[in-house]
Amino acid sequence: MPGGDRTGPWGQGPRTGRRAGFCSGYRMPGFMNRSVWPPFGGRWFRWFGRRFWGRRAGRAGRGRWW
């Protein structure tokens, strides 16, 4: 809700963004709402945790960023 006019980030109506702010019934703005974090329903570390990066680093060898 960039302009505070309850139209969402794309200007197409309420709840067209992350559904985390006043338009969804929360009492605080979206950036302060802790109920939307972590993303992906709590499966954040499945992709960005040790398992994923550990496998990639094992294939690429040491000294590479990916």
Swiss-Prot record:
Q: Cite the residue spans of the region called Disordered.
A: 1-21
InterPro entries to which the protein is assigned, alphabetical: DUF5320 (IPR035205)
The identity of this protein, by name, is Uncharacterized protein AF_2391
Q: Which organism is it from?
A: Archaeoglobus fulgidus (strain ATCC 49558 / DSM 4304 / JCM 9628 / NBRC 100126 / VC-16)
Write the lineage as a comma-separated list: Archaea, Methanobacteriati, Methanobacteriota, Archaeoglobi, Archaeoglobales
